[in-house]
Amino acid sequence: MEVEFNGKKVYFNGEINDIFDTHGPYCMEVEAIGEDDDGIEYSAIGTYDGEDITEIEEDTIECLG
């Protein structure tokens, strides 16, 4: 999943750092890890379906440096 943050495209490709809540077998609230084209890592809360990040809460995106 691709999200724009501060003028950069951030790619969340399924790397999960933590699972916060589970709503059945195919819907998990997670902390997702992504990166931009420069290799900078980002963290955000999102929804994971067991294979892919399906939604990112854009107001939770943080730059990890």
Each model region followed by its residue ranges:
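Short glycine-aromatic motifs
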Residues: 5-12
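Acidic, low-complexity, intrinsically disordered interaction modules
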Residues: 13-60, 64-65
